[in-house]
């Protein structure tokens, strides 16, 4: 099996397939994604999420914000399971979605834990990390506010955000309050989309 042109082991493929089946089952009663996108689970959600880990397999301690249906957090945790190392802390304040995430992690053997708290208070519980991810959550300025506590604790922190075609306007807006280094990775899924890699985040004084 290949995802985004990269080979995936049989073990990881089986974990991903089990996650997708769980997702379909839970989506009938818990609104994880729009029903209209269920036919594109692999191409639109799994593969899009897998880009995060494929771009940066080195970080061993991740935080995924607004994890929702597990994209990209559970997908990253599944890839880490193959390595037998690393961890993803998934932050999701919706109790139903948090319950799904717990079951997904347990049944796939993925390496992670779920924290049913608001993002604004997550840094009080999870004090350190190497990398942060978020998908379809908020604009960059707000995301930077969320991750700033971890950036202060770890100058080497990297963040990875899936963004659509309007990302340039978000970048310009964020420059008003923040200094940061930016690498734009073209999405392997959608021509107009990117994965933004953020480092050296500092609040302007």
Curated annotation (Swiss-Prot):
List UniProt keywords, sorted A-Z.
Cytoplasm, Methyltransferase, rRNA processing, S-adenosyl-L-methionine, Transferase
User: What does the protein in this record do?
Assistant: Specifically methylates the N7 position of guanine in position 527 of 16S rRNA.
Name used for this protein in its record:
Ribosomal RNA small subunit methyltransferase G
* Chief localization: cytoplasm
UniProt family annotation: Belongs to the methyltransferase superfamily. RNA methyltransferase RsmG family.
In the record, what terms sit under GO molecular function? rRNA (guanine-N7-)-methyltransferase activity
Q: Which reaction does it catalyse?
A: guanosine(527) in 16S rRNA + S-adenosyl-L-methionine = N(7)-methylguanosine(527) in 16S rRNA + S-adenosyl-L-homocysteine
Q: Its Enzyme Commission number?
A: 2.1.1.170
Which species expresses this protein natively? Agrobacterium fabrum (strain C58 / ATCC 33970) (Agrobacterium tumefaciens (strain C58))
Subcellular location per UniProt equals: Cytoplasm
Going by the record, the broad EC class of this enzyme is transferase
Does the keyword field hold Cell membrane? Answer: no
State the GO CC annotations.
cytosol
* Positions contributing to S-adenosyl-L-methionine binding: 66, 71, 119-120, 135
* Alphabetized InterPro entries for the sequence: rRNA_ssu_MeTfrase_G, SAM-dependent_MTases_sf
Pfam families per record: GidB
Q: Which gene underlies this protein?
A: rsmG
